[in-house]
Amino acid sequence: METNVEKNSGTATEKPSLFGVITSPSVQFERIRERPAVWGPLLIVAAIIIVGAVLQSLGTDYSELLKSQDTQGLSAEQMETVATITKFGGMAGAIIGGIAALFIAPLIYWLCVKVSGGVTTYKKMLSLSLFVSLISSLGLLVNGIVAFTTDVNPLYSTTSLAGIIPSDGALASVLNTFEIFSIWSFVLLAIGLHKTGGISKKAGWISAIILFGILVVFSLFSGLINSVAGA
């Protein structure tokens, strides 16, 4: 692989390596601050999201899931039609939502940096978002492969506490947020906000913890609503 180097006034700034975020995140985030990379990482992360979402949807037996819903009065053929629509609708939703999040998250990160007294740009935060999202998208891919090749419950990540601790309803939704790749990405986010956003380590960690806390609360209420709706 050729070395990406940009020369400027006698100095050389290396282009950040997307997969380098796995082994040397601090170095990549410092490079992003000087030379944010977008298009290459965007194509790679988007491709991983698409493959992961497709595998997870194809590995989900929606006919079985629909049996637990209020589907009385539907014939077997109608059930199959609903299951097919749900499968491909869920697949499209996961792909569109996953890619849209890549562009929405940088706005939140930008706000975190501004509130913490740092100075940054949307492009730098977009690059940071793509590098951090590599980890969560790899998690989606891993869980997609597991769902496609095994009979595990695809509603909850096998790499989360929900995949280890038997639970359902709101508790399962909360446990599902404590997922290896998700937590890893939030740790990288804390480092990235410090290195790329230029804010203090403390501010970076506080921002990441608050965002993770919001995710947990959202999952709790989502689980409660689904439990009530399914009651």
Swiss-Prot record:
Q: Which residue spans traverse the membrane?
A: 38-58, 93-113, 128-148, 171-191, 205-225
User: Where in or outside the cell?
Assistant: Cell membrane
The secretion signal range is none
Please give the InterPro entries that the UniProt record associates with this protein: Yip1_dom (IPR006977)
Q: What is its main location?
A: membrane
Q: What induces or represses expression of this protein, per its UniProt record?
A: Expressed in exponential-phase cells.
Superkingdom per UniProt:
Bacteria
**Record-linked Pfam families:** Yip1
Q: Does the keyword NADP apply?
A: no
Q: How does it sit in the membrane?
A: Multi-pass membrane protein
Where is it found, in Gene Ontology cellular component terms?
plasma membrane
**Which keywords annotate this record?**
Cell membrane, Membrane, Transmembrane, Transmembrane helix
Q: Does the keyword Transmembrane apply?
A: yes
Question: What subunit structure does UniProt give?
Answer: Interacts with a complex composed of YknX, YknY and YknZ.
Function of the molecule: Part of an unusual four-component transporter, which is required for protection against the killing factor SdpC (sporulation-delaying protein). Has a role in the assembly of the YknXYZ complex.
Name of the protein this chain belongs to: Membrane protein YknW
Tell me what organism the protein belongs to: Bacillus subtilis (strain 168)
Recorded name of the encoding gene:
yknW
